[in-house]
Amino acid sequence: MKHYDFFPSGALTLNGRIGKALAKNIRCRLETLNYALMVDPFRFRSEDDGAWRCEFWGKNVRAAILAWHLMPSDTLLQKIKTTVKDMLSTQTPDGCISSYPADKQISGWDVWGRKYVLLTLLRYYRLIEADPAILQACCRLVDHLIGQLTGEKADLRTCGMHDGLASCSIVGGIIELYELTGEKRFLDFARSLIESGCSLKENVFDAALNGVAPKDIGNAKAYELSSCFEGASIFYRITNELRYKEAVEKYFRAIVKNEIFVTGTAGGKDDCGEYWFDGVKNQVSADPGCGLGETCVTVTYMRFCEAVAALNEYDQSPFDEMENSLYNALLGAMNPSGDRWTHANPTPLTGGGWKASPPDQIKRWFNTPFDEHDCCRAQGPEGLAFGAAHAVLKLRDGVMINFYEDFLLHDTTASGEKYSVEVSEDYPASGKIELFFNSTRPLMRKIVLRIPAWAENCELSLNGENIAVHAGKYCILERIWSDGDSVKIDFKPKVKVIRPADTEDVFALKYGPIVLAASGKNDVVPKPDNIFEPFADGCGKIVNFKQGEIVLCDYASAGAKFSPDDPLRVFFEEKRIFDNE
């Protein structure tokens, strides 16, 4: 069990940048999708070309369920219920739910697609309707898969893509199913996958424990590999087998150290930016020879951060990482209309890179159009909803606040006492927040506040009395709260110079959690040691700064035209400062 959970649907209202982006994505994307079309490959078992149409239903509907949980809408709820019923109608008497014809099943991306169906049905069961028919369908789906693993295909690592990583990443869903049913056969199946190491190349968990660099684990496919480690985190929480906790934590530390860009995404090596490749060092290259930062990797990294956070009650570093990804790479990947997402992110980050909406992925690779679907266009909404859902979390005896989005929370204690918590002040732009507690009578509650690692000079007061806090540590206020109690936090952000490890003469700039970018074709380089002045008239929707004639805005807003005529720059070369003087 995790030490936190989501609040009931509708209890939390997000009013800031994240909430507004989520509302737009619901309205402009999730409520407009043709869900029936995404079910068709399963109904007709027509995916005979080895493609991955099978992932789009699960990815999109899973995101829609969590988005609905945060922002209830009759329109979206009806679409979700209709399409879930539609998907269940494709399950044959043997339990199979697959988009692949019988003779091609458990090859290609088939099990990967089944994974997303399983995860979506489980989320539906947890967040919308605990219908026994849903759980029964999940059991039959997994039992059918287990029954197919015989003879030459007895080892799931031999079935599918990336040396087994894609197929074996279903392990997290298998363990979730065990949690809900208590059926030992599902735990046994999950154990067999975990103990196989999930890759034909090697046991990826042993590799992490032995300190192997992420780029050398398995085939280094960041999305699939990290999904297997997410499954290992869930496995540890069920079995308490310490080696898997240690493997997950070592892998997390290794990718933070070696792979995560300043913007909170990662990935390179191919055109789409899909592989671990010493990203910290290579993100500053003017010619990386690949795309940088697949949005699917951003979202998977955010999910993996949460899987790490679930291992330790008060280790906030995974949420520090998630905040960076959420406010920069993830928000920056959604186009202003709210219906499209970048695949690879701007390449290079040293200037000239621009945000681009990807084409129909199935048409591109298989010459058969599929409603302009793309894996990252399907995954982006999950990242947005997932990040929003972890801004404020329910504790057994209180509230955990990770991201200081303006919000209003209405909660009820176990004994039926109602209270509310409200946060305002337009974080992160203002660098400050004010929290108000309201209740009809005094209540014992715990309010846990994340103090970001970058906020070294943070000041916090409770009802006007200063309380010592430490950057990178949660502040735990466990007390009897009265109506009108208030907390003020001044994070005291300033523009900081970021010089990635193992790089020379290159720097980026951050204001609190926000990466600053130069939008447009201006090649003038700011002086890192000079003062940056905030101003109101720039293109940034979160922050704008200038230094003389040099204008910078938040990375999420930069390059908003999604056009080669609107490039952006994140990294600046120090030697060019002198060239410009």
Label for each model-derived stretch:
Residues 1-56, 74-98, 132, 191:
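Low-complexity, Ser/Thr/Pro/Gly-enriched N-terminal "stalk/linker" regions
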Residues 3, 41-57, 98-117, 150-168, ...:
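Solvent-exposed loop and edge beta-strand segments that line ligand/cofactor-binding
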Residues 465-471:
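Short beta-strand segments within Ig-like beta-sandwich modules, predominantly Fibronectin type-III
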Residues 190, 248, 320-436, 470, ...:
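C-terminal beta-rich recognition modules with glycine/proline-rich loops and embedded aromatic residues
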Residues 10, 18, 60-74, 116-131, ...:
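Well-ordered alpha-helical scaffold segments within catalytic/enzyme domains
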Residues 46-47, 67-204:
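Extended ligand-binding groove/face enriched in aromatic
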Residues 442-462:
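Beta-strand-rich binding/interaction modules
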Residues 237-258, 287-339:
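Catalytic-core region of carbohydrate-active enzymes that cleave or remodel glycosidic bonds
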